[in-house]
Amino acid sequence: MASKKKERGPPPHSRSWQALTPPLSEWILDAVAAMGFTRMTPVQASTIPLFMGHKDVVVEAVTGSGKTMAFLIPVVEKLLRLEAPIKKHHVGAIIVSPTRELAEQIYKVLLSLLAFHAPSAAAIQPSTSDETADGETTLPSYPSSTLKVVPQLLLGGATTPAQDLSTFLKRSPNLFVSTPGRLLELLSSPHVHCPQTSFEVLVLDEADRLLDLGFKDDLQKTLARLPKQRRTGLFSATVSDAVDQIIRVGLRNPVKIAVKVKGAPGTEEKRTPASLQMTYLLTRPSHKIPAIRQILNSIDNTPQKTILYFSTCAAVDYWSHVLPSLLPEIFVTLPLHGKHPPNVRQKNFSRFTNSVSPSVLLTTDVAARGLDIPLVDLVIQFDPPTDPKAYLHRCGRAGRAGRRGLSVILLCPGREEDYIPFLEVRKTPVSLLESPPVALSDTLATEATSKIRETVLRDRALHDKAQKAFVSWVRSYTKHQSSSIFRITDIDWEEAGRAWGLLKLPKMPELQKFSGDRTLGVTLDWDKYSYKDKQREKHRQESLNSATTHNPLKRPAPSSSSNNDTAPWSKTLEKKSDKEKRRERKRAKKEREHWEKMTEEEKTKSRETHQMLEELRKKNRQELNAKSHTSSSVLSKPQEAELDGESEFEGFD
């Protein structure tokens, strides 16, 4: 018995790549060694054998734990261990990602892995690199019977569906890495085939977000086009929050793999990497910018990459214009949000990931999930996320692959402090920020507000952005899932306005009962406040002159009574007549619309009521006429005038 045990090789708990059963291909072992992965992470050691062994898997693991390689290796191995190559224009595997950036990241990791498989590298090379001017030879070609993996990246916005289909028909890839929308468009083509004989495996990365409302419909339609006899893997940091939805996806007896991080002895397990320090800082809204500046300045080693999270796209737009003057000069600021055109998103994301100088990425939750951005040392959350699940993913951009990281969330003193015990209940312990120390004062806050306003006063367009951003921030605040903690009634509007450097508070329903200073202490000649853009300023001036010329309220006048005295009486009468006609038309239209919406029973009752009213009016008129005959002719008209109102309905209850 002892000899048999020795023949089995390393114990099952070993995380050596050579210890896997079934064993990995030699070229994959070479690839992971060249990439610097000396041994598997816990999630890889648990997932790869099961996924390669024909099991559906639901994997819940902390962010930054190596989930990408945990599904890429089994997918590639499955496609390369088939009995025969996948037919032309047939798809063997699909990897679905919720965001463009994450899909691109997965695709790049896949290419770096396939570079070690010669047939696949030769098939991929013509589309990813061109021959040099000297006519250097490319990799050797292989017979069509050779098994290889040819991936295609599908992203909405970067190319059109027609271009993607053309690439598919030309190269005949057998593996898609895609976002949900573009994948569905391509699968809808009659030229793209996913039959049971060819299709092997489906991977849903960041599965809980893929099942959110925004992706649910596309995902269901996609699944309807795929064979049920397939292997499916769902990977996320918070799978447990979407279990009910995952069941409906159609996994067949899945194995659930949950990889947690153990804290110190006696403490509960955590859902974040041990190398990541998650902290909070209590600060008034107007102190947030000075706090961010101090953290960036006083942290031990200057963070190479920092991610600053805001709640809305409009907020990112606004702060990307005003923050550069507030942060230390060595930091480069870059905006990234979901409403950017695809080329802008790609450009800014690449600039941030490839930056050699300290950089700050201003973003929304579009950059909160799955992205493996190297050298992220610091994450600051200017606004808490509306969805508590996003908190964990935001923090997880730092402290990846064993690198030390710091996450700081800025909360206002008071009810928002309850967010900390709320996170602890969700197994996400957060401690008070002690290092680096942050010393705040009203003087620093006032200086920050003044600097923001100086920047905004240079261009009226920034004021417009500020108003839009503030309104969008308020809207997002009202939509917090933790509504008992984040309450709109607790906002100090003047304090919040100063924190954003507003020149005045915007007009919005939430401020209807606000009785404070809407100008925030700012005195400004709004007519002279101009746009930097000459065309916009020209248009504004024209609108201003037009309003002054045609709107009597804009013209200086001694009093409203004098204007009324000089206006012709006939025109006043005409205006009144026109006004009455408009009212009558509106009333008739409302009655007509109301009548069309009524049921037949309601219409019958309405007719009966109308008939009763007419009879009563007729009766009252007859009585009125009878009285008028007995009265003097002098009093008859005034009496009619008195009785043409309520008296018409006298006796009707």
Curated annotation (Swiss-Prot):
GO terms for molecular function: ATP binding; ATP hydrolysis activity; RNA binding; RNA helicase activity. It holds the Pfam family Helicase_C. Residues 291-444 form the Helicase C-terminal domain. Keywords: ATP-binding, Coiled coil, Helicase, Hydrolase, Nucleotide-binding, Nucleus, Ribosome biogenesis, RNA-binding, rRNA processing. One of its GO terms (biological process) is rRNA processing. Residues 558-569, 627-636 have a biased composition (Polar residues). GO terms for cellular component: nucleolus. Residues 48-257 form the Helicase ATP-binding domain. Residues 534-653 are annotated as: Disordered. Its EC number is 3.6.4.13. The keyword Lipid biosynthesis does not apply. Residues 571-627 form a coiled coil. ATP-binding RNA helicase involved in the biogenesis of 60S ribosomal subunits. Binds 90S pre-ribosomal particles and dissociates from pre-60S ribosomal particles after processing of 27SB pre-rRNA. Required for the normal formation of 18S rRNA through the processing of pre-rRNAs at sites A0, A1 and A2, and the normal formation of 25S and 5.8S rRNAs through the processing of pre-rRNAs at sites C1 and C2. Belongs to the DEAD box helicase family. DDX55/SPB4 subfamily. The Q motif is unique to and characteristic of the DEAD box family of RNA helicases and controls ATP binding and hydrolysis. Component of pre-60S ribosomal complexes. This is ATP-dependent rRNA helicase SPB4. It comes from Coccidioides immitis (strain RS). The gene is SPB4.
